[in-house]
Amino acid sequence: MGPRSRQRRTGTVQSTNDSSSLSKRSLAAQGYVSDAFAPLLVPGIVRRTPLIHRGYYVRARAVRHCVRAFLDLTGAIRSPTRAQILSLGSGSDSLYFRLKAAGLLTRTAVWEVDFPDVSRLKAKRIEETPELCAQTGPFKIGDSASTLCFESSDYRILGADLRELQRLGEALDSAGLDATSPTLILAEAVLTYLEPSRAAALIAWVAQRFPNALFVIYEQMKPGDAFGQIMLQHFRRLNSPLHGLELFPDVEAQRQRFLQAGWTTCSALDLNEFYRRLIPADERRRVETLEPFDEFEEWHLKCSHYFILAASRGDILSETPVFLPSEASFQIDPALPSGFLSASVVTSDHQHSSLQRYGHTSVLLSPGIIFSAGGFGEQEGRHCRVSRFHLLSRSCDSEWKGCQISTLGTEGQWDGRLYHTMTRLSDTRVLVLGGRLSPVNPASGALQLDIYKSEDNCPEGQNVVVTKAALEEGSMLSCWRHSTTEVYYQNQRYLFVYGGRSVTDPVLSDCRFLHVETMAWVRIPVQGSSPEGRHSHSACSWQGGALIAGGLGASEEPLSSVFFLRPVSSGFLWESIHIQPSITPRYSHTAHVFNGKLLLVGGVWIHSSSVPGVTVISLTTGLSSEYQIDTASVPWPLMLHNHSSALLPEEQQLLLIGGGGNCFSFGTYFNPHTVGLDLSSLGLGQ
């Protein structure tokens, strides 16, 4: 690497460090963690989003867990030498200061290594900040030619390149690091920025150099799915490509990577498992109520694409595992796939007429017309709550075409709600219930949408009239992520509204019935054991009742249960459907009944490293089977959450409409076109 390339590399790393450090500062400012030193080390004030806060919180807790485990282990033994923490690629991290202030460094010292420019800048900030100097005690600042940028009795900062191992070893020796002492080597999002051969050399070098060591890394994984592809694209755009993910795509591959490099033991968890297993429930509840939050899909996907790993060598650090095993396995993998369902793009519409949004709702008005409204998407070159309606239509056997349609007149306007429901009342009329404008602002009232055709019957010429639905007063439905299902009782048509969440309730278990003919809320007796509250579940009409499947429960954990609200003479009866083999808990999916089978399509799950496809459940036997979606013919990442879908039973096809999400800090992604799933393999005999 030449001087210019090295300089560009250092600048990119500095930019990455600055962004991460600002996120950590924002994390502390909002009360997720206690860190009085982050603001002193990181200039500037930025308030990150709740999603970023949660992502950095679980990262901080995972690293904290490993550091505390190391300090507990080394503190319990009598050693003639002090324990050591060696932080690689430490940037502006405040670890030393937090440990020192907590009194946890009485028998431990800290060494940090980063690029020279990064390390010198940190040393200068410490020198200029009295509160930081008070923690370090007397110190020395190295000259510009020295790799040792800062030195105190228990803290040293070095400027060195992790790819130059011989020089790194010499610098650590000169800085007083004792290779024989128990040592924690910490690398937060570091190895992945090294080329695979360089990272392998570093892992082996550390194993050979430190006979009593714990190596902890926090990094990305799972590059192959849609979220992983967006993640890779993001870092490529930053000129900081992620290396080695294809070689080590999951936690088991990462474990074998370290074991084969000379480490005695190694364990690793993705951050969903770490969060649910190793953070106490009361602490999780505290964090989950710090800020209004409604990006569960992206939160869980982020956690499934990062892992924390601890590899150890030597008798001292290998006897006690850092991640104690749990009594019950966290993994709930789906059954082996019974087959594949081919996916293909069914629209060729231009960008201005495509449906690029998520959190919307779609309704099949007639076999050739699908109407969509709401959601967050792209409109007039910016990302926003979408105000325009979308019509997907075709005539005879022609291809599907999409178009944007507008509101007619000035009496009513679409309010831009998300996570609402829409129900077809006729070929030209739709009822909208619930939804939200923001996590603290529910949508106001029910809406009636009337679609008016143009004189030439051209889809582009159609208009929508928005009016307040004439529901009885005092019946405000202030929830979102709920379901609305058509059911029948005493030969009368009702809409069954179930579940969801609100500003005050993280989950709802309410059952409400709207009489369609009179638009009045009515009370109908419901017997049986009620399902636990949930949101982001699916609901389908079947045999006059409703099938409720999956969803996210009160503890923000996906559910696997399937219930049938069965019509009976006295009202309705909740029945639990026994499924074999049991299915992986999921939410944010869609569902349809097809040929006597319940199809659960896409969604998000946290208990398996695979990607949800289509789960098929026989409604007569309860037998389930799994089908993967073959996306080889889809030329872009297909994200199947926050989407909508429409079943075309006569054609044995399912249309997947919209979908995507705000992919952590990697950018917002929208599925650009409508995709069709071929269901012909799920015939009556399957």
From Swiss-Prot:
Point to the regions of Polar residues compositional bias: 10-22
Give the enzyme's EC designation.
Answer: 2.1.1.290, 2.3.1.231
**Where on this chain does S-adenosyl-L-methionine bind?**
R59, G89, D114, D161, L162, E188
Name the catalysed reactions. 7-[(3S)-3-amino-3-carboxypropyl]wyosine(37) in tRNA(Phe) + S-adenosyl-L-methionine = 7-[(3S)-(3-amino-3-methoxycarbonyl)propyl]wyosine(37) in tRNA(Phe) + S-adenosyl-L-homocysteine; 7-[(3S)-(3-amino-3-methoxycarbonyl)propyl]wyosine(37) in tRNA(Phe) + S-adenosyl-L-methionine + CO2 = wybutosine(37) in tRNA(Phe) + S-adenosyl-L-homocysteine + 2 H(+)
An example GO biological process term is: tRNA methylation
Gene Ontology molecular function, alphabetical: tRNA methyltransferase activity
Query: Region entry Disordered: which residue ranges?
Result: 1-22
**Keyword Methyltransferase listed:** yes
Name the enzyme's class: transferase
Question: Does the entry feature the keyword Transmembrane helix, yes or no?
Answer: no
Q: In which pathway does it act?
A: tRNA modification; wybutosine-tRNA(Phe) biosynthesis
Key words, A-Z = Methyltransferase, S-adenosyl-L-methionine, Transferase, tRNA processing
- Which SUPFAM superfamilies does the record cross-reference, listed alphabetically? Galactose oxidase, central domain, Kelch motif, S-adenosyl-L-methionine-dependent methyltransferases
Could you say which protein family the record assigns here? Belongs to the methyltransferase superfamily. LCMT family.
Per its database record, what is this protein's job?
Probable S-adenosyl-L-methionine-dependent methyltransferase that acts as a component of the wybutosine biosynthesis pathway. Wybutosine is a hyper modified guanosine with a tricyclic base found at the 3'-position adjacent to the anticodon of eukaryotic phenylalanine tRNA. May methylate the carboxyl group of leucine residues to form alpha-leucine ester residues.
User: How does this polypeptide assemble, per the annotation?
Assistant: Interacts with RNF144B/IBRDC2.
Task: Give the protein's recorded name.
Answer: tRNA wybutosine-synthesizing protein 4
- Organism per entry: Rattus norvegicus
Q: Which taxonomic lineage does the organism of this UniProt entry have?
A: Eukaryota, Metazoa, Chordata, Craniata, Vertebrata
